[in-house]
Amino acid sequence: MASMKRKCPDDETACGSGAGAAMCVTGCGFFGSEATNNMCSRCYREHSADNDAVEEAAAANSDLELVGVAETTTKKARMSAVVPVAVASSSSAAAEQPAAKAATAPNRCAACRKKVGLTGFKCRCGGNFCGGHRHADAHGCGFDYKSAGKEQIAKQNPLVVADKLATRI
């Protein structure tokens, strides 16, 4: 029975490796199989992912070409209507840009000019204040809280008054 064992050649790393076990064709040092085109599992995965990406790009490219042809014909027909609208929207966008900058500018306390960033407190008088000046008496607020409170209560609690009857008195 000892004579039936086969001796390992010097170039093989394990005894019993059959004809199906060959080194990976990419030269990474692992064994490949015929099912994976003589590549190891890692190299085969990378190779198939690359092929899939190339096929998807080609498919997307052909779709874009078909869509591009259809779009150019419709764009030529609509070009005269689109140009005046684009000019009007660009002028309105230019007018909105300074207003947007002015809205983001108050990052400082209105009383002491200290940077407040996101931690600032907005008052009803319209100012942005730090923690020390957030109360109305600390920054000399001109907002009339008393009348605003009265108006708010009047809106929330409407007075129910019955109509006077002419026959009754």
UniProtKB/Swiss-Prot annotation:
SMART domains attached to this UniProt entry: ZnF_A20, ZnF_AN1
Cited function: May be involved in environmental stress response.
Zinc finger (A20-type): 18-52
Organism in which the protein naturally occurs: Oryza sativa subsp. japonica (Rice)
Keywords, ordered alphabetically: Metal-binding, Stress response, Zinc, Zinc-finger
Origin superkingdom: Eukaryota
Sequence intervals crossing the membrane: none
Chain sites annotated for binding Zn(2+) 3: 123, 125, 139, 141
Cysteine disulfide partners in this protein: none
Renumbered zinc finger spans (AN1-type): 103-149
Designated name of the protein: Zinc finger A20 and AN1 domain-containing stress-associated protein 7
Residues involved in Zn(2+) 2 binding: 109, 112, 130, 133
InterPro entries in UniProt: AN1-like_Znf, AN1_A20_ZnFinger, Znf_A20, Znf_AN1
GO molecular function, one term: zinc ion binding
Residues noted as binding Zn(2+) 1 in the record, renumbered to the chain: 24, 28, 40, 43
Induction conditions: By dehydration and salt stress.
